[in-house]
Amino acid sequence: MPIKLDNKLPALDVLRSKNVFIMDENRASSQDIRPMEVLILNLMPTKEVTETQLLRLLANTPLQINVEFLYMASHKSKNTHAEHMETFYKTFDEIKDKYYDGLIVTGAPVEQMPFEEVDYWQELTRVFDWSKNHVYSTLHLCWGAQAGLYYKHEVDKVPLSEKLSGIYKQTVDMPENFLMNGFDDSFVSPHSRYTEVTLEDIKNKTDLDVVASGQEVGLSILASKDLREVYSFGHFEYDRDTLAREYRRDLEVGINPDVPANYFPGDDPSQEPKLRWNLAASTFFSNWINYAVYQETPYRLEELEDDFSFYGYL
């Protein structure tokens, strides 16, 4: 959270140069405060697990956040009871006239399919179009990031030679970016995907900043300069055992996967994995809520209706 200081304090400029968020007296006296409204578009098959993972991270912030869940009505969920969906989720038609401070678009196990062949693709593009003037900042995760880049910037995903699965080191490329506040020069997080987007495409087709990347994972975090578009290709939200469950699931269906890298002690799947990304995960989500959403979103969300300036794909 920001700290309030006297406008004339000499340390003010020094602190700002070190990426410390400062609120001067003028802004502090005029700031309106209300709960944040966040919508989660949950595309994962294990919806209740993903709900818990994301809510745990959002709950670490000191802000009051009202959360709603959205699902794609054009897709029938096979892994979640209909009663759960009817009770806790809303369709796009039910929320399309509302406004939100933040939207989280999760990953989905469909990345080896062309985007247009995903059964809910048309509905998803409606959500992307709607979000232009109904959401302040959108956080896209894994396949959700690839889908957003494809639709908004015409950046397609590229197949990897083998699945990227494990805990990987990444480097902070833009320490001055508020999303990286509180991060060390490097951090680790889970990745689990068969595809990637290339730096060449990002440079040629977008004006997004590369916030973090890694030698093994490639691009990790991208963001627009105003943080209204944020793309994360990893899985900060994963629990300690998520990669283990994915590994055993793949074994059961005969995929014969590699053991997730840098995950099990001694690469022994019988051992309990070490949890090494929890602090980075909490910091990233807190930074997104605070700097990309809370500090910049209008008090009256209806004002988003007239603001199209932040989307480079318009």
From Swiss-Prot:
Its EC number is 2.3.1.31. Keywords: Acyltransferase, Amino-acid biosynthesis, Cytoplasm, Methionine biosynthesis, Transferase. Its main location: cytoplasm. It comes from the Bacteria. GO terms for molecular function: homoserine O-acetyltransferase activity; homoserine O-succinyltransferase activity. Disulfide bonds: none annotated. The active site is at residues 142, 235, 237. Pfam families: HTS. The record marks 111 as: Important for acyl-CoA specificity. This is Homoserine O-acetyltransferase. The lineage of its organism: Bacteria, Bacillati, Bacillota, Bacilli, Lactobacillales.
